[in-house]
């Protein structure tokens, strides 16, 4: 906890949150290294934190992944058998709060089938890479080449 608080004070985390008495966060250096290497970085974070990340990094793509219904969410939480009913009720309450901000995300993905959900996330991310405003360098290069034809 003390080391984490030092990292917060030094602005070494892109995002962080305290959840169920534990700190969670993403080191800035790690994310910057991955992005510079041309890799995508996927963060599983709460809405308030996601919106802060989007403020700091406007190119951030926000995907809201949700089960098909509240009943299914409860069923999955209970089915795990790893949490008490108090924790399940708390998580359901948090889900209700998070759902209030669904429209602030760029995409909504309904996780009815895990593999389909993963494939859809992949398609969305790949599609974002292909958007023209993200490919300015290629576009300019192509225009220059075509001028010489």
Label each region the model flagged.
Residues 41-46, 55-79, 111:
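Conserved phosphate-donor/acceptor-positioning beta-strand/loop module used by diverse small-molecule
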Residues 49-51, 117-118:
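Short, well-ordered alpha-helical microsegments
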Residues 82, 100-149:
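NTP-dependent small-molecule kinase module
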Residues 60, 70-72, 78-100, 115-116:
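Ras-like small GTPase catalytic G-domain
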Residues 33-36, 54-58, 100-102:
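Conserved catalytic network of the ASCE P-loop NTPase/AAA+ motor domain
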Residues 1-41, 48:
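ATP-dependent small-molecule kinase phosphotransfer cores
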Residues 10-14, 76-83, 124-127:
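Conserved AAA+ ATPase "sensor/coupling" helix adjacent to the nucleotide-binding pocket
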Residues 4, 42, 95, 109:
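Residue-level signature of catalytic and energy-coupling elements of molecular machines
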């Amino acid at each position: 906890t003390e080391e984490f608080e030092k990292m917060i004070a030094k602005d070494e985390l892109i995002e962080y949150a305290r959840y169920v008495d534990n700190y969670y966060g993403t080191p800035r250096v790690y994310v910057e290294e991955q992005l510079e290497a041309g890799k995508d970085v996927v963060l599983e974070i709460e809405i308030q934190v996601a919106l802060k990340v989007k403020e700091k990094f406007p190119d951030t793509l926000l995907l809201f992944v949700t089960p098909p219904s509240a009943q299914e969410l409860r069923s999955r939480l209970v089915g795990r058998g790893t949490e008490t009913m108090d924790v399940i009720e708390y998580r359901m309450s948090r889900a209700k709060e998070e759902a209030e901000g669904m429209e602030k995300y760029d995409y909504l993905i309904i996780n009815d089938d895990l593999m389909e959900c993963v494939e859809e996330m992949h398609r969305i991310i790949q599609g974002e890479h292909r958007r023209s405003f993200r490919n300015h360098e290629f576009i300019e290069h192509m225009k220059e080449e075509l001028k010489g034809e």
